[in-house]
Amino acid sequence: MRVGRLPTFKNESFNDFKTYFENIKFCTINTKQIIEAGLAAKQWVNTSNIWFDKIANKKVLTSPQLDKFSAIQNIGTEKNLLYFNLHGAEDSDACDWYGQENENYPSAFSPSNILKQESLYILGVEACYGARYINYKKEQSILLSAMTSKCLGFLGSSKIAYGACYGEGSCANVMIGTYLKSVRNGLSIGESFAVARSELTSKRKLNAKEIKTLLEFSLYGDPSFRFIENSNQKSFVAQKSISKLHIPMPDVLGAVNLEIAKVSEKIESIVNNSIYSDYPEFNGIKPIIYKDTSDGTYSAVYKKDNEKFIQIIDAYFSEDGQILRTYVSK
């Protein structure tokens, strides 16, 4: 089943979402008229560019090179496929998405920015709490501001999201990158979400971070909507052939089959040195070591408090201390 939803909020009215249904009914954007834009934290530019090249054959804009005051001028207001790989936060006062370069975390995009978009658009965001809306006012949530203005489809996470800084990445990188690439290729937003979930589950046995990604990313908007293929079609007409994708239900308990463990000082030192080298902003932070009781793998979790949010690195490593995979919170 392809399911989308509309977020609710305190003191909402029918008119808040009336615009959405009018927009989706009369949208006439075809696949040849798609104009993409991407904005990413400088820290994640490598992985962001790999995915945005697949989506748009372009490079992303970066923050802190741009902040929320300059981003909208550089992104423009006429784009209709938007990609964001930024930080997000849960705090009610931290309403924006944030860039990063080393220890600099500027506000990169805000609810007021999204209201300036003039074209109808589809959006995907990798940020932690990128799709937050429960117990927030409209002006505190980019999701709410988007869905009550020009947004036709929005995919994001309600909780902490994870990805990588280099290579094709993982988790949120795969989810949002595959989703927007599929939308760009003419699939409905519901089908695109299904393809993204299928891509995430197809490689191997899922670990805790991948299971959480499947549970935390939600689609907002009519799942049957897609950019039309020619000017004689209507955007809300279902595809004639809908692929049958098998997406196995994740083992939710697998996300919590962890126990605190100990390794030798030598092994912990090897792991720490690797993390401190790749992520110098975490230098000196001591990790908590966990063991997955289902398969015996180890992970080291580093937490760093910033002014607006907590950053997390979860590094899976072998018995000899070699880093196998690294997940970075968004």
Q: Could you describe each region identified by the protein language model?
A:
Residues P248-K291:
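Short, non-transmembrane alpha-helical segments in secretory-pathway proteins
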Residues S63-D67, N135-E139, E307:
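Short, glycine/acidic-rich beta->alpha junctions
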Residues M1-Y20, N85, E90-T178:
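Catalytic cores of nucleophile-dependent amide-cleaving enzymes
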Residues F282-E319:
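Exposed beta-strand-loop-beta-strand "reactive/processing" segments of non-cytosolic proteins
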Residues I35-F84, G88-D96, P106-S112:
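Functional beta-strand-loop-alpha-helix junction segments that form "active/interaction loops"
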Residues I29-I35, A56-N57, T77-L81, E118-I122, ...:
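Loop/turn elements at helix/coil->beta-strand transitions in domains of secreted/extracellular proteins
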